[in-house]
Amino acid sequence: MTSNSDSTMHLSPPPPATSAVIRTRSPRTLCALGDEVQLHLTGADTDGQYSMFTVITAPGGGPPTHVHDNEDEWFHVIEGKVGFFSGGAWTEVGPGGSAYLPRGVAHTFKNLGDAPSRMLVHTAPAGFEDFFAELADVCAGAEAPDMEQVVAVSARHGIHYVQ
């Protein structure tokens, strides 16, 4: 910010934002509580603004009901039939449909079909990919993950499970 002698204030322009074009690359694939997560964009790609990943969920699968402290989520169903719980109600969404689940609101999703569902998910701000990476380490090689460890990892990333 600068000023001159006539008391007029002049604001300096904001620094230019960086942009990224990501050519086709193989996504990093992680397992998170039975879901396959394919990371496409991370905070490193977007200056921490958002993350983008694909979630593939087995029939009947989905996370426990939970609340995020840090990020909002947008889901776009590519394949399958998915039920979203938010605001105390379930809504069924098919291919081409989307759901917005803001931070601070208890929510979950469940694959309602008899084949794997596929969703493109955005989270903002970025960082949720770090949760998946740590959770994948906890779940690696385990038939059923240690839920105490899952809860601890989740809490470190601002995710809390509710009844």
Describe the role of every protein-language-model region.
Residues 1-50, 141-163:
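A short, N-terminal "cap"/entry segment at the start of jelly-roll beta-barrel domains
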Residues 23, 74, 81, 88-106:
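Short acidic-glycine-tyrosine-enriched beta hairpin
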Residues 33, 59-61, 82, 100, ...:
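Hydrophobic small-molecule pocket/channel-lining residues, especially in calycin-type beta-barrels
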Residues 36, 59, 70, 89, ...:
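A generic "binding-loop/recognition-motif" signal
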Residues 36-42, 53-68:
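Conserved short histidine dyad/triad with adjacent acidic residue
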Residues 45-48, 57-61, 74, 81-82, ...:
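Short, charged/polar surface micro-motifs in flexible loops or helix N-caps
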Residues 46, 83, 103-129:
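Ligand-binding loop in jelly-roll beta-barrel domains
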Residues 114-150:
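A contiguous, mid-protein "functional segment" used to position or interact
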